A protein has these predicted regions:
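A broadly conserved sequence feature marking short terminus-proximal activation segments
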Residues: 140-203, 214
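Charged, amphipathic alpha-helical stretches
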Residues: 1-64
Length: 239
């Protein structure tokens, strides 16, 4: 069962026309990581991504399929960090390919959550990240010092991908940064909501709650995601 493949495919289709740069992942490129949350005061900031009423979206799609190749890379849609001069719309999307999700259904669910939680282990120097899991928003406040020291999406992306290397069975990561104002950020926000809905549905299924398909609130997802209905009925039967 590939929970996120439809969203992953739609994301690639939507953003392909906006790609401005692609960089192969090199761990030597990684921007310094402080290992803890950093405070960037307003008086020290250059600008914010996803702040001050601008869209700010983040989500992670995991697949075992071949829609992603085996090369990890950072992909930019829009201007790079040194080129941005004011608060900007922003999205950061991780497309993760693994060779397999191992173990029981519960084990596989935990592996999906682990991939989604990698973002909480990345602390680029000179960046204050504020992530809201409830709304799938991400805001990034950049310091002027980081801009002066040469921060870029290529280097920040390498920092993120380095953190993903701890995932079991990892094949590749496509780390997308989006800053082009012409991108449909509402569509990306809807995709983020869809990712979270699938994770929530899988969690509900694994709890073993019995259900009547005709009245179940997850019926649209079961209709859309191949294998989800069978998994749901199996766990309801075993509850």
């Amino acid at each position: 069962m590939e929970l996120f493949d439809a969203i992953l495919s739609d994301t690639i289709t939507q953003l392909n026309p906006f790609i401005t740069h692609r960089w192969s992942y090199d761990p030597a490129d990684a921007w310094p990581d402080t290992g803890k949350s950093e405070l960037v005061l307003q008086r020290d900031m250059a600008y914010e991504l996803g702040g001050e009423g601008c869209p700010g979206v983040q989500y992670c799609c995991v697949t075992t399929g071949s829609a992603l190749d085996e090369m990890s890379e950072i992909i930019l849609c829009g201007p790079d960090l040194p080129e941005i001069k004011e608060n900007s719309a922003y999205a950061r999307i991780a497309l993760v390919r693994v060779s397999a999700l191992d173990g029981t259904d519960d084990d596989q669910y935990r592996q999906l959550c682990e991939a989604a939680f990698v973002k909480y282990r990345v602390f680029p120097k000179g960046c204050m990240l504020r992530i809201s899991p409830e709304s799938n928003r991400e805001q990034v406040r950049l310091s002027r010092q980081a801009i002066q020291e040469g921060i870029s999406f290529r280097r920040v992306g390498a920092d993120f991908i380095r953190a993903y290397q701890t995932l079991p069975n990892l094949v590749s990561v496509k780390l997308l940064f989006v800053t082009d104002p012409a991108v449909d950020y509402e569509a990306l926000a809807n995709a983020a909501t869809g990712v979270q809905a699938r994770l929530n549905a899988l969690n509900t299924i694994l709890s073993g709650l019995a259900t009547d398909c005709a009245s179940c609130q997850m019926k649209p997802l079961c209709d859309e995601v191949e294998g989800m209905r069978e998994l749901h009925l199996q766990h309801a039967k075993n509850a």
